[in-house]
Design a protein with these regions (language model features):
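Non-catalytic cap/lid and distal C-terminal segments of serine-dependent acyl enzymes
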Residues: 2-16, 39-46, 53-355
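Short stretches within intrinsically disordered, low-complexity N-terminal or propeptide regions
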Residues: 19-21, 34, 48, 62
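Short, Lys/Arg-rich cytosolic juxtamembrane segment immediately N-terminal
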Residues: 26-38
Length: 355
């Protein structure tokens, strides 16, 4: 498997990012064309060369050339600030190696940070796809959001903005990326833990956007006894968010987020779904009491994910819906195992996108 990729310094501004100092447009990491400047220059040049002569026959003005599309360079990494109902959202992007229009959305976990998407530094995801003709799209933020449109801002932690992540990922972000040559219809989405069921939901309910979905160690049976309260405890622990602000118990909004409920909408969609059993494996080397505690916690969470994934497998089977399921013999709820599973899912993702 490829080794961890080093991160690059990025100069960022709203709307689009500029290349690191010393790099010029047209290189593998150049900036997108300056559309408005080019349009003005083109119109000005056209005006200068129009024939103006006394007695000349009336002449129709040619329509100005369309503004060039903001197209990303082939390959390279940038950070974009994308407008949204929630305010500007940072999105880390690794552009397709050969300028292709396919994209893979990599969603973060329950403890998503506000500075970087963990896929970019906890795993070698960027290097895994560095030679592929697919753009990696890594939204930043969304702690405890489940990437959903909430009914209200959380009232247990003073949240001032209501989460509207589904709208961002399916409306605002694809519209923004389209200006860079990324297709609105040739995408895949992959999530882990919190974002596992979110990835399946986004693909199920937005079939025109996503051609493939993957869930790694996701809790996929929200109707299981005690699951809502388990989710409540997890969200309080990760940022003191209130699950009731996301969706009321058994409301249409809540049921819409339950994979067991929206499962029929997944028919015909290529899927990769996995969970380990929670038993320690090759990546578990706890050091000290703190390490042992973290490993024990990761074992328990993965075991819950494993049971719910088995239930979801049975649900799909009862509906006659095909999906690829992978259950490693060992593994806990941690990033190195998800890195391994991403590598397993990669060929299927690239095949679905034609990349």
């Amino acid at each position: 498997m490829p080794q961890q990729q080093k991160e690059s310094g990025i100069h960022m501004r709203f709307g689009k990012a500029t290349a690191p100092k010393g790099e010029q447009p047209g290189t593998s990491r150049g900036v997108a064309p300056r559309g408005w400047r080019n349009r003005i220059l083109a119109v000005g040049a056209a005006a200068l060369v129009l024939p103006i002569a006394a007695g000349a026959a009336p002449m129709a003005f040619a329509a100005p050339a369309p503004a060039p599309v903001l197209r990303a360079p082939a390959g390279g990494y940038e950070e974009l600030m994308v407008p949204s109902k929630m305010g500007p959202v940072k999105v880390q992007v690794q552009w397709a190696r050969n300028g292709g229009n396919a994209a893979l959305y990599l969603l973060d976990g329950l403890r998503a940070r506000d500075d970087r998407n963990a896929w970019s530094f906890e795993t070698n995801a960027m290097q895994q796809f560095s030679n592929d003709n697919v753009t990696l799209v890594m939204p930043v933020g969304g702690q405890s959001s489940w990437y959903a449109d909430w009914t209200a801002a959380s009232n247990t932690n003073g949240q001032k903005t209501t989460y509207k992540w589904e709208s961002f990922l399916t409306e605002e972000l694809p519209a923004f990326l389209e200006g860079y040559g990324v297709s609105r219809t040739n995408n895949a989405v992959l999530g882990l833990s919190m974002s596992g069921p979110a990835a399946l939901r986004l693909a199920a309910l937005h079939r025109n956007q996503f051609k493939h979905a993957s869930s790694l160690s996701g809790p996929l049976n929200w109707g299981a006894p005690g699951m809502r309260e388990a989710i409540r405890v997890m969200m309080l622990d990760a940022g003191r968010f209130n699950v009731d602000s996301m969706a009321a118990p058994w409301s249409p909004a809540w049921l819409r987020m339950d994979p067991m409920v929206f499962a029929p909408e997944l028919r015909g969609l290529p899927m990769f779904i996995s969970s380990a059993n929670g038993l320690p494996g090759q990546h578990d080397r706890p050091a000290g009491l703190g390490g042992m505690y973290n490993t024990a916690n990761a074992m328990g969470i993965e075991a819950i994910s494993f049971v719910s994934t088995l239930a979801f497998q049975s649900r799909l089977k009862s509906l006659g819906i095909a999906a690829t399921f992978d259950f490693p013999a060992n593994g806990t709820h941690s990033w190195k195992y998800w890195e391994d599973q991403l590598w397993k899912a990669r060929p299927q993702i690239l095949g679905a996108l034609g990349a």
